[in-house]
Amino acid sequence: FGSSTLEVIGAGIETKDNLNQLSLALRFDGPGLSFLDTGDGEKEVEQALLASGEYLRADVFKAAHHGSDTSNTSEFLAQVMPKVVLISCGKDNDYGHPHQGPMARFQMLGAQILRTDEQGILLVAPAADGQSLNTWVSGIDEAA
């Protein structure tokens, strides 16, 4: 990827009972693409990232915790300002992911929203003229 970088910008928050809070926050920067992934980190992880002073703006944001209401706060998203939001979630999952609150916040940003339960495999790659977005639906397990 030439001059691209992948950086751990947050190492999570240690807790006794919530392993989601240990999620790493990763930032990729390359020609034509910036990407932010906060794993399953929840509101407290987002607050720590905001307080850290890290540069959070990204073209593409992988929605935290499958698009859960436990994260993806308005304050955090206002700093990220993604053009594209990727949501990894199973079709008809037991948790109701993605939740309506984050979906409304993503829409208010005007971001393109892509979901694995609807579009299948999501591939984002740097391209000379920006990012390349591809989806692949074949093979989605309708019963999952």
Where does each model-flagged region fall?
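Core dinuclear metal-dependent hydrolase active-site scaffold
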Residues: F1-V60, E118-A144
